[in-house]
A protein has these predicted regions:
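Extracellular glycan-interacting surfaces
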Residues: 1-338
């Protein structure tokens, strides 16, 4: 399921403009997207879109709207968007396991400040595919006050979280292959200049057919600045227990940025989509050359890695090599699938 926003404007009378917020669903085995009901109201174009849709497994999704000056509201569906019911957004209770279809996030460790501006400490929460409610994970990995979980599981069923090693204070990642009941943590190899750089913004992990890749995202020193700077790329051949730093970004050379996740393929192949172009490696990330294709944002979904390119063009891959393209909300075909 996806959330689509279509706006109608009137240049002569801007107050007549409106944006319709709709849901489209691609049912299992179907060849095309179909419109479904949405609990969201029409909004004026000047307000901007504040809603987001989170898929929680087949036929299940959560819509969250509001924040800032707008009231917070949430709705959950378990029947593919045919009906929606209101759910609360606050974290309620604890869960010992991350169920299939769940999505991970964070919230403030109680007591949280009111209004919430910045948490002193954050915790990992599980958005349940059963009811769309948030519950704190009972046994999270020990990765400091700002754990950063990947939203969804990797293809092998593993869940990943990045943060700070509590002993050394260095950047680290942890994975679980038993639904969050236990975690294995490892420290990432530090750059020689790590002490002179600000803290990382994030570590983005992608599991491939024969290796795991972890991209460090954070401010660079020297060279042309970017909005999504990649400091380094690490590779693991033992499922994330140990790491080798294969790429360190310098003042020149590409890739210097990464839009979303690295795309791992077989036999040492990995692609990094930068802000200007994609770059491919066939030696496990030690060297890169320009690849075909335009700029894209890469993220993990339940159907593989999703490439979001131009306004209405998308593609998915399960092996990092073959991509299945489709259009969604294109002007000449609204909506379509393939």
């Amino acid at each position: 399921m996806v959330l689509l926003v279509q706006c109608v404007t009137d240049r002569d009378r801007p107050e007549n403009g409106f944006c319709r917020q709709r849901v489209a669903a691609l049912d299992r085995g179907a060849r095309s997207w179909v419109p479904r009901s949405s609990p969201l109201p029409e909004i004026p174009p000047s307000r901007g879109v504040t809603a987001g849709l989170t898929v929680l497994g087949p036929g299940r999704a959560l819509i969250e709207d509001g924040g800032g000056e707008e009231p917070e509201r949430s709705w959950f569906t378990a029947d593919g968007g045919r009906s929606w019911r209101t759910v609360g957004r606050r974290t309620v209770g604890i869960t010992p396991v991350i169920p299939a279809g769940a999505v991970l996030g964070t919230d403030c460790v109680p007591p949280a400040p009111e209004p919430v501006q910045e948490c002193a400490r954050e915790r990992i929460v599980v958005i349940s595919p059963e009811d769309g409610r948030r519950r704190a994970l009972a046994r999270p990995p020990r990765l400091g006050d700002r754990p950063r979980p990947a939203a969804v599981a990797e293809p092998d069923g593993s869940w990943w979280v990045s943060g700070r090693d509590p002993v050394s204070g260095r950047d680290a990642v942890a994975f679980s292959r038993d639904g969050g009941r236990s975690w294995t943590s490892s420290v990432l190899p530090s750059s020689p200049a790590v002490g002179s750089l600000p803290p990382l913004w994030a570590v983005r992990v992608a599991v491939g057919p024969d290796a795991v890749y972890a991209a460090e995202v954070g401010e660079l020193r020297g060279g042309e600045p970017g909005k999504n700077p990649m400091r380094a790329l690490h590779r693991s051949l033992d499922g994330g227990r140990t790491w080798t730093r294969v790429w360190t970004t310098g003042p020149v050379g590409e890739p210097r940025t990464i839009t979303g996740l690295p795309v791992p393929g077989p036999a040492g192949r990995v692609t990094v989509h930068g802000e200007r172009a994609p770059y491919e490696s066939v030696d496990g990330g030690r060297s890169f050359f320009p690849a075909a294709g335009g700029t894209s944002w890469i993220r993990r979904t339940g159907i593989g890695l999703l490439k979001e390119g131009d306004r209405c063009r998308y593609a998915t891959t399960r092996d990092g090599v073959r991509w299945s393209e489709f259009g969604l909300a294109c002007e000449d075909s609204l909506p379509v699938g393939g």
